[in-house]
Amino acid sequence: MTTDIEWGNQQKWPDCLVIVRHGQSVRNVAKNEAKIVGKGAFGTGLRDVDTPLTEAGRLQAKHTGEYLSNHFVFDAVFSSPYRRTVQTTEGILAAFEMKPPVVLEERIREIEFGILDGLTREGILELYPSESLRREREGKYWYRPPGGESRPDVALRVHSFLGTLTRDYRCKKVLIVCHSVVVLIFRRLLERWGEEEYIKVDREDDVENCSVTIYTFDQESKRLLLDRYNSAAHLKETRPKAP
């Protein structure tokens, strides 16, 4: 797949993409606590799509909005329709005097985990040992759980979304609020990664809650180039403490 769509010398990309992961959610906290104590599941009693932000997550969104409003005026905003991303978007835009239109975009929603939703590695091994083996054999990038998605599945829908940006939002400044896997998939597509590059960056560090990733259009190459990745300097006071 390629995302470098060009018609002659005319710019077809937005001037910049600012991609933000949602703030800390109730699900994030439950998952981290389950990992610490070795639990097999981290249920919250809510569907993934309905999971809200924590108070810390709301504060992260507020601080992110204060930071972005001092550096950008956006022409358009796209948010995953999940509750935690919508709340993050609302928290960010509260800092803006001029609020651009917000589009709830299903193509940038969270990866679908299928039957493994809400399970830790220990839980998968206990409840679905054959899936645990298949997951190890196929690898994190290609593995598709029953009823769920692989990373390439997510890439297909994000690639379609990028096509919309090149068609309708050229020369615009665009804010995108989404999820950690989707942030990495944007990088995989825009920087033309293969599996090895994706896994390498994924292993190096987690995409932080409310971190900012920025691409800017380069006139010489006619492409969006990475300006910064996973930047969370504006969140020093609101980062969750390491266990």
Where are these regions (language model features)?
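Active-site-adjacent alpha-helix immediately C-terminal to a catalytic or transition-state-stabilizing loop
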Residues: 14-17, 86, 160-223
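Loop-to-helix element that buttresses phosphate recognition and phosphoryl-transfer chemistry
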Residues: 29-92, 144-159
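Short, well-ordered beta-to-alpha junction loops that form the rim of enzyme active sites
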Residues: 22-23, 79-83, 107, 147, ...
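A short C-terminal helix-loop "cap" of Rossmann-like NAD(P)-dependent dehydrogenase/epimerase domains
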Residues: 38-43, 102, 129-138
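Short N-terminal binding/cap micro-motifs at the start of the first secondary-structure element
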Residues: 26-30, 237
